Amino acid sequence: MRGLIDPDLLFPAEERTRALARRLYAEVSGLPIVSPHGHTEPRWYALDEAFPDPAQLLIVPDHYVFRMLFSQGIRLEELGVPALDGSPVETDGRAIWRRFCENYHLFRGTPTRLWFDYTLSELFGIDELPSAASSDPLYDHVAECLTRPDYRPRALYERFNIEVISTTDSALDDLGWHAKILESGWKGRVVPAYRPDAVVDPDFQGFPTNLDKLGDITGADTGTWSGYLDAHRTRRAYFKDFGATSTDHGHATADTANLPQAEAAALFDKVRLGKANADERRLFRAQMLTEMAKMSLDDGLVMQIHPGSFRNHSPAILAKFGRDKGFDIPTRTDYVTALKPLLDAVGLERDLTVILFTLDETSYARELAPLAGVYPALKLGPAWWFHDSAEGMRRFREMTTETAGFYNTVGFNDDTRAFPSIPARHDIARRVDCAFLARLVAEHRLREDEAYELARDLAYGLAKEAYRL
């Protein structure tokens, strides 16, 4: 590595342990990337067009970036974040880039700083930190790179050594971009994941219309409970035809329910007609998690649950800029009681995989590791979102390994919209895990040959196996 990234990044300071971490890392640094969960756009791979200017690629869509800048008084309009009402925002990519570079010091100590340093150094060959003075030269260099064929999406997919990448797609998506990828003959593997929030959450914008659309595209009668469930089965099968191996569920809580079908049907009728109160809407979401788990047992799709985010905390930002604009905040999350109805129904099934994530780190050792350490259907997803920093990944290992071990976890997933940062995120995860394993060997808690095997599993094998890729 060159420039902004030290070869010993994130390795232990103690010399003997650091030397072992280096050796472990040398064994895994070149392994292919399995990216089983993320938010890149299938359109990029289908069209394989040049990315836009540096700001539109690296700044405007990245909520990790603009939320920090916003916290320091820089308006989202100044960063080019589009407003829903079409009101003016900055469109000059160079001006947006300059604001970012002038404030690069704000990211010191954050994972965003590591990801950007890595991307600038390893992808663009830059060895100078962003600053007011370096802003224009860096912009010109990155912009020139983006005009070249070797910086287009498919070329970068291959350069990053990606073996497979999953997008996250609405249950209502026609998967047209995925179809174009398959029709193109390109050998890259881009698969969808079934995200049904728009048709299982009564509080989702346009829910009644979404139910009608679900019926239209499946031919099922979504005016009835049985027809509604059949519509989900049809869509899941459609996603599987395009290579999907997983579903994803972004609920506010991990609450589940397992009502008798007659009660579930009556609840669905109230929800569909807009007559359900807040408790009934919550109960419906809980019931649907269990229904999705039962369907996963039937069709083999791995189920991911990403609960615990207070979405769109600022109503003013939501009204002006829409969802996913940096105002999603972690909340306390219960799993032991919340998941019990689902686990009572299907938790002992060895052929089911439910991957649990959390934004509440206090639940790692108290709830999640003990649950995954005994229920065959459960696995622990890696440190997520606010916690996918080097420190967050260390905390995850330290708080879960003693109870769940390594093999009830699923390796790493980058969960990103920022395509250029994917190799950075995987590299940092591999470094953190190699450092953790080296420490266990140094403390005589793990044999060195076991550490090498574990390093490969954590970097590659566990994700591939858990997500059935």
UniProtKB/Swiss-Prot annotation:
EC numbers on record: 5.3.1.12
Keywords: Isomerase, Plasmid
Pathway: Carbohydrate metabolism; pentose and glucuronate interconversion
Domain of life: Bacteria
GO BP of this protein: D-galacturonate catabolic process; D-glucuronate catabolic process
GO MF annotations, alphabetized: glucuronate isomerase activity
Top-level EC class: isomerase
Gene3D superfamilies according to UniProt: Metal-dependent hydrolases (3.20.20.140), uronate isomerase, domain 2, chain A (1.10.2020.10)
InterPro entries: Metal_Hydrolase, Uronate_isomerase
Known catalytic reactions: D-glucuronate = D-fructuronate; aldehydo-D-galacturonate = keto-D-tagaturonate
Family: Belongs to the metallo-dependent hydrolases superfamily. Uronate isomerase family.
Name used for this protein in its record: Uronate isomerase
Organism, scientific name: Rhizobium meliloti (strain 1021)
